[in-house]
Every structure is written in C-alpha cells, then in structure tokens.
Amino acid sequence: MNKGNDKLVERLRSNTERGSILWRLVRPVVRPVWSLIHNRDYVSNYDRDYYLYHSCVLPPRELRGRLGVSFLADGFYLESGIAEARRLAARLAYSKSSLVVDIGCGLGRLATGMLWEFGDVQYFGIDSNPTFAEWCQEHIERNHPSFRFIHLDVVNELYNPTGKIDGDRIRLPLADATADIVYLWGLFTNMGPEHVRIYVSEMSRIAREGSRIFLTAFVEENVPEVSFIPKGYVPYECVKPLQCVRYSKEFLFSIFSRYGLVVEEFRHHGGAFPSQSEVYLRKEKVAA
C-alpha cells in the first residue's frame, strides 16, 4: 500500500483500539441501549434510512452498529471504506476493467469507498444478511447499476440464523474464472473450518488464473488449529462461538494451498481492527 494509505490505516487502527478501550469502560452503563440497537429489527419505513456524509450515502447507524461500535462514526465508516478501495489499486492490481467480488460485503463499505475513489466500476457484493443486502440494493445498486448486490440465504449464526442454505452446500452465483479480485474482509473471523474450506474452494473456482485475493482472519502460530473465542484474544465481549474464530497459520495456509492459492504476503495483526491479520493470495496459473 502507498504511504498515504498506510498512514490512514494506522490512524484507523489507533481509533479502533481507543474505541475498544473506551467501550469496555462505558459498556456497563450503555449496554442496555447498545443491545436494543444491535438486536432491533430493521424497519423499512424509517423517516430516513440513510445518512449523507460529505455527499456520500451511508447506512443508518442502527445498521452500522451491528458491524461494530467503530462503524457508528460516519467519518470512520467512510474513511475505512476509502482505505480498502485504495488497497485494491495499490496491492491487488486493480484497474477500471477489473471485476471485484466482495464476499461478505455487509453494508457495502468497500463499495462506498470504491465509488469515492473510482466512480462507477464493476463490483459484485454477496452477503448472508438480508437486511444488509436490501439496503445496498436500494441505496447503492439502484443509483449505480454496475454495482450489484445479492442476498445469499446461507445459514450464519451471527447474521442469518434462519437461512435456508447450509454452508456445506454453498455455491457462489458466479461462473468459473470470472473474478479479477476476490475480497473477504472479516469473513473468516466469524466462520468455522468446515465452511472456510467450502469458501476457499469457491473463491478459487471463481478467480481467474493470476488474479488476486485479499482476506482478513485471526491467525497465529503455535496455537490449536481452530479456537472459538480464545480467552482474552480480542478487546470486546463475545457471547457466541462464531464471534471470534482463530486459526493456526499452518492449518489455514494448508487450506489455501490445497485449492491452488499462493500466499504472497502475510501481515500479522496488520489490519485496522484488533488482532486481525491480512493475507494476500494469488490464484496460480495452470501450466500448459
């Protein structure tokens, strides 16, 4: 990444760490209100179901709060999306002809950053949360049709517990070898190993030969292959097993290798969020 974006990411990381510390201090007082916001059902007839910030359409804070307390701040949400868009150009060989596939796109944070940086380009976002996908379709895709969003009704304990598709039967709605960049921010941090294997297989299937893949995960050396909510690992409260899933580096990297994905760079705890590591992959070219 370029130096300017590195500084932006570092500032976002510092803000996240400070926010996590502050949240631990004030949580006993505000937790009832936070629980209400976090668990409330989305109502489509809000007087205003979006925010305008520096001429950008942002999701309402009621929805952003479900992704993490840091995203409640308009500036943080937008700047973090811009930083991720710049990562595409600086590290993942992005060009305006690239098709970017965002698996676990949430509320379109990357898409918002891409619109800021690049304008109307090719983007395909997938998420298991129907409310998130609906908001993106209404407020991003509707005005920018080259940005497409779909709801994949796969079961997810955190975001879509009533889903109809089991993760073992997942197939991404894209043809083989169509994606130039596959992006998975924070997906494997909340996913068990049986489903990680399926998603790695699928992202390898849809990626073109030589294409780039970026993801974040909780990864450490000299730890068990898989740990659900390892004690003291993240600075926020976890009450469900999938709120923090940590992998051993050897175990996770062996899955990548099995499906023809080469690790180009691993940045331990390099992400803007506590304990998340960054992994840069390349889809191997098949020898003629």
Model-derived regions: residue spans:
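A short glycine-rich, Lys/Arg-flanked "PGG" loop and its adjoining helix->strand segment in the class I
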Residues: 197-209
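Short catalytic micro-motifs in class I SAM-dependent methyltransferases
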Residues: 186-187
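A conserved beta-strand element that flanks and buttresses the S-adenosyl-L-methionine
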Residues: 183
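Conserved S-adenosyl-L-methionine
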Residues: 104
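Class I (Rossmann-like) S-adenosyl-L-methionine-dependent methyltransferase catalytic domain
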Residues: 2-91, 96, 107-114, 122-171, ...
